[in-house]
């Protein structure tokens, strides 16, 4: 049984490592293209964001493909961006096209040592291109005009959500050929007023409004021309091939960076940049959403429910990757008015809010193939946090609950190990008796197990059952934005990254060593040497694992030691009195 147990432990380490390698292969960040790399290092480029640049950004209403890049000339960059600030968002809108070209998340600092610098989700400078575009294309759409994308006018150069104000509306206006357009952005207060500053700092889900990171975008079309106006609403996300700035793990693990869409056949369909390099994706869907994913954060366009849209992905001539959709044809008679709208989500992957916004959008929190186990674990962890208010202590409480759930299985395993420890002298005698005759030795061992009523797999099955739970918890701690920059106590200021002083991994190695002392010594000398190396090997691996995961492993080991010691002493005491 000890050999089988050792094989299982080694298998767990190997399987975990292979899963990491496979995840990187499937979902790792793409290498920065040579063209983009040279562009980023070019000197003299402006630091301020620029407009999209060409009308080739605009899809055609019929196919969703790119426009003619050869025929379209660059559009002049607008002189001044429109600044908008709420309690959770700090963004900039380019009047040329009305695109959101900058967006910072005020509640999520880029680094712990710089809490005043928000994490930059959108950017359109020399370092990175990532922005949200929307407009009107088609026969009479202003974004499809040969004159270039419309230059909107705003009554103010900056807008800010005032104290006590729950909604902020920003109107951009434009007129052409007798048609008046208003592009309206609606922003919402992110944090609930009845929550304390401490609760807001803890980012409790109960303190975040469900529309905190939703931006309403609507077009009001007033046709004062003498003919019927016809056009299509489009929305898309454009990003270059740069690396994920939110990926901070030190284990070599890269979470998925790429596009995803909702389709009738798949509520969560990934379309990586490698897929876009090969071919365009096009499909007609009703409702749904299109999104761009990165570690911890997501951006998604959600169209009007019930309408048919043409979803597409493509790669433009500048090496940027685009995912978006084009809506059905709108018709506005002369003298008539029409309003059409959609929603932009730009923020953290808050599963509850994403699910309420659109079905399937919560799946952008990608827990891998064990999602059906990971989601209940996260649900329980989140509810514990709502009571405790600290993610570190919540992980400890979750570990205790998981240990209690597996108590019967663990107890059976430890009882089997205790019996094995009791008969280890007999096992050693069998080995000495049969020497190198492994067949006879195995037969004698099985007879001994049968006589002593020992199940040789009794210590293995509990480990096999708990493997999926461990792997699921790994992805919960790695993928959940709630763990980002979440402190525990003392030196652990961020549970999502490695322990800066490696204290937890060393403690974990110590607990593994104590566990070995409680287990029977393997009869095989080579196996005994391998088992002695396991604490060192695991300690080395866990040096770069997220502190939250190492904390779980340490607490689990401590509870296992206590449980094993209690059961072993109980069995030994019963044997003495028998």
UniProtKB/Swiss-Prot annotation:
Q: Which InterPro entries match?
A: Membr_insert_YidC, Membr_insert_YidC_N, YidC/ALB3/OXA1/COX18, YidC/Oxa/ALB_C, YidC_ALB_C, YidC_periplasmic_sf
Q: Which GO terms describe its cellular component?
A: plasma membrane
Which cysteines bridge via disulfide bonds? none
MF terms (GO), sorted A to Z: membrane insertase activity
Which Pfam families has this protein been placed in? Answer: 60KD_IMP, YidC_periplas
Where are the annotated segments for Disordered?
A: 34-71
- List the protein's name: Membrane protein insertase YidC
């Amino acid at each position: 049984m000890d050999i089988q147990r050792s094989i299982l432990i080694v298998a767990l380490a190997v399987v975990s490592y292979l899963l990491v390698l496979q995840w990187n292969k499937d979902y790792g960040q793409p290498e920065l293209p040579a063209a983009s790399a040279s562009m980023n290092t070019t000197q003299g480029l402006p630091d301020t964001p620029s407009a999209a640049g060409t009308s080739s950004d605009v899809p055609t209403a019929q196919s969703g493909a790119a426009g003619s890049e050869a025929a379209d000339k660059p559009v002049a960059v607008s002189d001044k961006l429109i600044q908008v600030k709420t309690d959770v968002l700090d963004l900039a809108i380019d009047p040329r096209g009305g695109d959101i070209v900058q967006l910072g998340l005020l509640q999520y600092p880029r680094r712990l040592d710089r809490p005043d610098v928000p994490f930059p989700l959108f950017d359109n400078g020399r370092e990175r291109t990532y922005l949200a575009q929307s407009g009107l294309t088609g026969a009479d759409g202003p974004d499809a005009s040969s004159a270039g994308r419309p230059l909107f006018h705003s009554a103010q150069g900056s807008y800010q959500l005032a104290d006590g104000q729950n909604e902020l509306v920003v109107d951009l206006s434009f007129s052409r050929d007798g048609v008046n357009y208003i592009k309206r952005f609606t922003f919402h207060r992110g944090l609930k007023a009845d929550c304390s500053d401490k609760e807001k700092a803890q980012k409790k889900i109960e303190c975040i409004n469900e529309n905190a990171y939703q931006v309403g975008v609507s077009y009001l079309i007033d046709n004062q021309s003498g003919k019927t106006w016809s056009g299509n609403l489009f929305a898309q996300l454009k990003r270059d091939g740069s690396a994920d700035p939110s990926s901070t793990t030190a284990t070599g693990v890269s979470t998925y960076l790429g596009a995803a869409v909702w389709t009738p056949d798949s509520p969560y369909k990934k379309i990586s940049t490698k897929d876009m390099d090969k071919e365009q994706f096009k499909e007609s869907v009703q409702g749904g959403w299109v999104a761009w994913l990165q570690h911890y954060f997501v951006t998604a366009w959600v169209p009007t429910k019930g309408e048919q849209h043409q979803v597409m992905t493509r790669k433009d001539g500048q090496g940027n990757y685009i995912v978006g959709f084009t809506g059905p044809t709108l018709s506005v008679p002369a003298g008539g008015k029409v309003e059409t709208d959609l929603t932009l989500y730009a923020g953290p992957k808050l599963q509850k809010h994403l699910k309420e916004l659109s079905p399937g959008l919560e799946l952008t929190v990608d827990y891998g193939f064990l999602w059906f186990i990971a989601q209940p674990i996260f649900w329980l962890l989140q509810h514990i946090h709502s009571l405790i208010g600290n993610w570190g202590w919540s992980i400890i409480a979750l570990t205790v609950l998981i240990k209690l759930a597996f108590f019967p299985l663990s107890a059976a395993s430890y009882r089997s190990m205790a019996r094995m420890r009791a008969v280890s002298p007999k096992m050693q005698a069998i080995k000495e008796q049969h020497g190198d005759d492994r067949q006879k030795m195995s037969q004698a061992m099985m007879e001994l197990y049968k006589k002593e009523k020992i199940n040789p797999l009794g210590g293995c099955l509990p480990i096999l059952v708990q493997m999926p739970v461990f792997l699921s918890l790994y992805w919960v701690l790695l993928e959940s934005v709630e763990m980002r920059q979440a402190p525990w106590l003392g030196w652990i200021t961020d549970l999502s990254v490695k322990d800066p002083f490696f204290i937890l991994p060393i403690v974990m190695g110590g607990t593994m060593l104590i566990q070995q002392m409680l287990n029977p010594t393997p009869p095989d000398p080579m196996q005994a040497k391998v088992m002695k190396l396991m604490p060192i090997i695991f300690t080395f691996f866990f040096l770069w694992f997220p502190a939250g995961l190492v904390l779980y492993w340490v607490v689990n080991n401590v509870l296992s030691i206590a449980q094993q010691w209690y059961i072993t002493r109980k069995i030994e005491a019963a044997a003495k009195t028998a």
